[in-house]
Amino acid sequence: MKRLYWSHISMVRKCPLRYLWYKGHPDHDLGAGLGKPKPLAFEERPSEHFKLMGSVLSKVVEVMYNDRLLEKPKDCLSKLTEVAQQEFEKLEQTHHIMWTYLTREEAMKICLDGVRNFLEIVKDHRMISKSYAQSELSMTPQINKSLKVCGIADLVYRDLDGKLWILDGKNASTPMKYEDEDQLRWYALCFRLEYGVLPDKLGFFYFRYPKSNPPKKNPDPSSEWTGLVEVSLTEDDIRRLGNEAIETHRIIERGVFEANPVPKNCSFCEFENICEARQEQKRLNAAKRKPKEPKEYDNYKTFTLGSGKL
């Protein structure tokens, strides 16, 4: 039985060809054998420092909730700081990192600050439970006879008022600029199919920006920044994503993947430099731009050189 994750949906939405190159397909040999992803030369591989930091902070959330550290709140900061340091040192051995965008020390600081900020968000929003809390919750329900829709939620918990939440933590520097709210709705779809109920609340929380350190640009200027952004959910969202899952599976099974170059998406794609469609688009865009006209100088004007005049 085939499995479909949110990352599959998101990639096929934005660019089917990137999905093919990133995931591979049994009908295609992209240079490494049938079914294998397209290989990239070492110099073309993007740095995974953002992925590294995100994985470290996800581990922090997982340990805090699954190991029930909230039962001893005084020890949380020291234990989670240790978890972050150890996870960082472990993962940097397996990730392709180029310390050019930021230094190793800066990345470590972002993670350690993220621990402290996360605890502040937990306190401010009372993200505690006396009945149910699970981090890295894996869901793999069937949506039809041939397909499972899958998701791994950062945090699912029932709050002290009885409301069921699904939350996703983000290490983004610009909240809600690149997040897709359908990611959380996808997890809600998976949860409904797995457990028979919809969550009451969905939201993103931001490791860099607790209430005490708001971002420069609040995605909702009409309200105070709190470190958590709620996302709406309706039955129509669930039906829409269920239908999209089935259609996306059909597209993948058909095995025809066309490029869909869009600059804002291509800028995050590791294959941008080798994608013919994107390079052709860039050439056409460059040709449309008017060439800069050379500046003409009036020989009779006065030019200033240093403190003297000619």
Where are these regions (language model features)?
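Charged, glycine/proline-rich intrinsically disordered loops and linkers
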Residues: 27-45, 88-96, 113-116, 213-226
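Non-catalytic protein-protein interaction segments used by genome-maintenance enzymes to assemble
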Residues: 134-186
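Metal-dependent nuclease catalytic regions and adjoining charged, substrate-binding loops involved
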Residues: 179, 191-310
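Short, well-ordered amphipathic alpha-helices
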Residues: 116-119, 187-192
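Nuclease catalytic cores
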Residues: 2, 6-69, 268-271
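A non-catalytic, helix-rich entry segment at domain boundaries
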Residues: 56-137
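Residue-level recognition of the N-termini of beta-strands and the immediately preceding loop/turn
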Residues: 131, 164, 199-202
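Hydrophobic (often cysteine-bearing) scaffold residues that line and stabilize catalytic clefts
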Residues: 49, 53, 107, 111, ...
